Regions:
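Conserved active-site alpha-helix within GNAT-family acetyltransferase domains
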Residues: 91, 95, 103, 115-133, ...
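A short, internal acetyl-CoA/4′-phosphopantetheine-binding micro-motif in the GNAT/acyltransferase core
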Residues: 78-85
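Active-site rim helix/loop that mediates acceptor-substrate recognition in acyltransferases
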Residues: 24-45
Length: 142
């Protein structure tokens, strides 16, 4: 995503945060997500457009896989505006994420979803990805 397109994604990011019951902080978002504008060593922010309207985004974080001794990509965020769900935009963002990770030489693309997000799980099952047998843990460090 370019600098010129950046301001258009911030309202979608806030919508994504509200979906997961987090209270958006516009100033913090503006600083944090700027690090993913291309080119970036931290990751990549991808947008999905329908005409002039930004209707979805994905955030990739560059990371590592010790078991494979290789770089990997984590699709940490995937969001499609409510009025555009079911139009293939989520699948297109996953495919664009996989392409971007592959072009960067990543071994694999991984992502997580909430256990009760069955809509997203149905989408993910269509990508050819395999469901992991791992549990995801989170330790707050505040």
């Amino acid at each position: 995503m370019s600098e010129a397109e950046y301001e258009t994604v911030l309202p979608l990011i806030a919508g994504y945060q509200r979906f997961y019951l987090a209270e958006p902080d516009e100033d913090r978002n503006r600083v944090f997500f700027r690090r993913f504008l291309a080119p970036s060593e931290d990751g990549l922010l991808l947008g999905a457009w329908k005409g002039d309207e930004l209707v979805g985004f994905a955030t990739l974080y560059w990371t590592f896989s010790s078991t494979h001794a290789a770089e990997a990509a984590l699709m940490n965020d995937l969001f499609v505006a409510e009025g555009h769900r079911g139009e293939g935009i989520g699948l297109a963002l996953i495919q664009a994420s996989a392409t971007a990770a592959h072009e960067r030489g990543m071994r694999h693309l991984e992502w997580f979803t909430a256990l009760d997000n069955e809509t997203a799980q149905r989408l993910y099952e269509r990508t050819g990805a395999e469901r992991s047998g791992w549990y995801n843990y989170e330790l707050l460090l505040e």
